[in-house]
Amino acid sequence: MFKFNKAAQQQRIDNRNSAVTGHDPFVRPPVPEKKVRNIMKKLHKANGLKRSNSAIEFDVSALTAANRRQIYSSNRSASSEQDNSDLSEHSEKSPLVSARLDNLARLFFSKSMPAETGSRDTIDSVLTTRPNIKYQYSALDSGNGIVERSPRERAQREKALNATQEWIQGANGRYEVIAHLDEIGSRHGKNWFLVTDASVRTDRLQTLLPLPPDCVAFEDLPPNECAREILMELLGSLHHPYIYPVLDLGFLRNSSYNYACLVTPFNSRGSLKDLIYKAQWNEPWARKYTRKPNGLPVSQVQRLGRQILEALLFLKERGFPLHGHLHSGNVILQNGAARLSGLENGLLGLSSRINAVMWSRSVTEIENVDIVCFGHLLYEMCTGQELTTPKPSMRVLEMELQHYPQIGQTRKQILEILGLIFEPPSGVCPSVEDLVLCDLFRSIDLRELRGPCFSTIKPSLSRSTLNLLQAVKKRQCASLGHSLSEANSPCTPPSTPHDRRTGVLPAPYEVFRMY
């Protein structure tokens, strides 16, 4: 029996060895059934159904391509789909071509309707046909996509657009109007346009200003002098990191209107007032400044305040007359720096519509106007609010600044500067140099003044330009004397954007705004 079992075992070994040929890797011995079940279970577990990917695990490029296809397909109008039904296969293969054709059709359609230049559809078509624009622009309307305007306002805007087109034609087609913007400022009759400078292929901001009948550039200059050349010589000589430049200037004078056209760089960051109110630069003035303002951090107040003082100091060294229009709306923020704008207002003889100094009865020196305006601006940067009186008392300022904890340990330094401006110990208003040497601004590092582009060489101006500066100074002194002669009349604070919109008369001693 033992020999029989041993012989059977030997037979099974011989049969197993005959099933393989040496070390052939393609033929393997049979695997036990239990081991086979374990292997199959592991394979099913490894290659089974996986969970769906979350949004963060999706391929970004695939999502972008899908979104583009969806946008292109939704932008196509119903008429174009019916007319081009036989080209649907080609459109699916090349959606970029069909989208560009639709955008060109929109652009041509918007240009054929000049009265609707400021509408939402026109602005949207501009954005889609200009993919290289690095900023986001959209007209914020009242909900239905159409800005409601009275017939008189529409007629004024159409008149301003026609005047701008006339000036552009006189400039040999250098500029092209992209959009007629809303009233982003408070000056009555002023219009803003987004234009393209064809010479450098760059977008610019063009403003159309109504000139007063007694404009300095035409009243105090000889008839044989060209006002445009003189003003461009003066404005072109003001090269400074904290001065917002005027790139081009022109005049339109005829029997129906009297305008000045100015071209400045386009800046999507807006003004200092836009930063305080956290508003978009292109929102209407009557809407964006009705929100709750916020004070700026102390470090930002120090840096921006020092930059504004450096701009005023530069104008003083160049013999430029006082600014007279210094407020947060005329401080443009560009690359983190404050740049003073609105220099052309004083040269053209434009009066400041709402100027806190003109409501004061104690400012008798013309040089102190910008200093007092800077005090109002400093308070607005720290608190976000505007002063309710032209020259507040220090006791009121101390009580007000206690409600703003973000000022911190610099409250004493801020009160020191405000005290020098509104209640000077010696009765003499401080100069710009005195404010620069205060502890709040003295240690601020100005990297823009270290660059090689900044030059301290004072350019020589022509005799005609110097005569214009003297005429502007005399006109400003005369206007200040006229405002002081009317000091016996009660001061009526100007209206806020909300009051202008609703027609409600402001209450006495209400907070007024400087624009």
Swiss-Prot record:
In-chain residues carrying the UniProt-annotated modification Phosphoserine: S54, S79
Mutation effect (S79A): Abolishes phosphorylation and interaction with 14-3-3-zeta
Post-translational modifications: Phosphorylated. Phosphorylation of Ser-54 and Ser-79 is required for the interaction with 14-3-3-zeta but not with that of Slo.
UniProt feature, compositional bias: Polar residues: 7-20, 73-82
One Gene Ontology MF term: protein kinase activity
GO BP terms, alphabetized: modulation of chemical synaptic transmission; neuromuscular synaptic transmission; regulation of membrane potential; response to starvation
Gene3D superfamilies for this protein: Phosphorylase Kinase, domain 1, Transferase(Phosphotransferase) domain 1
Role of this protein: Regulator of calcium-activated channel Slo. Increases or decreases the voltage sensitivity of Slo, depending on the absence or presence of 14-3-3-zeta in the complex, respectively.
Annotated protein name in UniProt: Slowpoke-binding protein
Origin species: Drosophila melanogaster (Fruit fly)
